[in-house]
Design a protein with these regions (language model features):
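Single conserved hydrophobic/aromatic residue that forms the stacking wall/gate
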Residues: 1-12, 276, 284-286
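C-terminal domain-boundary segment and adjacent tail
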Residues: 106-145, 263
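TPR/TPR-like alpha-solenoid helical repeat scaffolds
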Residues: 50-66
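Metal-dependent polysaccharide deacetylase catalytic core of the NodB/CE4 family, i.e.
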Residues: 73-93, 137-143, 150-157, 164-286
Length: 286
């Protein structure tokens, strides 16, 4: 029994070690070398584990080779509106299709843009990495350039999405406050499902589906495969107007009559729950 307990202890220790190493490698892949090193050295007895010793040495070497990006004013910014999930419905000849063609991008186009940026050496940075407030000696506040350290040849870029409200004209053909199959082929709201940000989407048959139907979950999907496209966990910056609600939640007073008091109250509760649930773990900025 003693030997068996020791054996189980060794197995658990090895599993913990592997978990720490995987976490540290992920942090280093996103250029957060200090946190990667801290993850390794925070493991009890790391000095006696060759894999962890080597990982620490590798992270220190990568940190030493990183170069500070010289001029934050040259960092490009690319932005998108809500992405088109169903082109057949978006470009069906109605008066809205001209605007969609001019101002929107499809999911396929967005994914192609991400892949192109990645292949050209761009790395997504948080807008607060570019510059931040610094209190001056006289008590005033001044925005100063941030310190972004990347491997030679890598270039920072800021990504944002505008109007993340999923307006009625895009999703709700009968204006009853609920998305339907007569919509123009866009996601209808953001929500958390199974612990992940995802989108609700009503397809042409009227089925309510959940998945990567807009920028936020699509970007997460890409970063799952390419963690080195994100600088220290950076995501996109998203903006809302508040017109007809936010993130697809109809919380403006105009919808009290359309939805009824109970449904309207639930929509408001869902919206608050959505924003609060993810506030501590998301890098999206409003």
């Amino acid at each position: 029994d003693v030997e068996r307990s020791r054996g189980l202890g060794d197995v658990y220790k090895r599993q913990e070690q592997d978990t720490v190493l995987a976490e540290a490698k992920h942090l280093a892949a996103q250029y957060d070398y200090d946190k990667a090193i801290a993850a390794v050295t925070g493991f009890a007895g790391w000095e006696n584990v060759p894999e962890l010793q080597q990982a620490k040495a590798d992270f220190e070497a990568q940190k030493a080779q990183a170069v500070r990006y010289a001029d934050p004013t040259t960092i490009p910014h690319i932005f998108f509106h809500t992405l088109i999930a169903d082109t057949a419905r978006a470009f069906d000849g109605d008066p809205e299709q001209g605007g969609y063609n001019q101002f929107m991008a499809t999911i396929k186009e967005f994914n192609a843009v991400l892949q192109s940026l990645y292949e050209r050496g761009f790395v997504l940075v948080d807008i607060h990495d570019v510059a931040g407030p610094q209190q001056q000696a006289d008590g005033s506040t001044k925005y100063v350039a941030g310190d972004i350290y990347l491997p030679a040849g890598k270039k920072p870029i800021v990504l944002s999405q505008d109007d993340v409200c999923y307006y009625e004209y895009m999703t709700d053909s009968d204006s009853d406050g609920k998305p339907d199959k007569g919509g123009d082929g866009f996601a209808s709201r953001l929500l958390v499902k199974d612990g992940k940000l995802t989108c609700e989407y009503v397809d042409a048959d009227g089925q309510t589906l959940y998945g990567s139907y807009d920028l936020v979950p699509l970007l997460d999907d890409f970063l799952d495969q390419h963690p080195d496209f994100s600088y220290r966990g950076a995501r996109a910056t998203i903006a809302v107007t508040g017109y007809q609600g936010a993130f697809g939640y109809r919380i403006s007073n105009d919808y009290k009559e359309k939805l009824g008091d109970e449904a309207f109250a639930q929509a408001c509760t869902d919206a608050v729950s959505y924003t609060h649930l993810r506030a501590h773990e998301t890098s999206l900025h409003l």
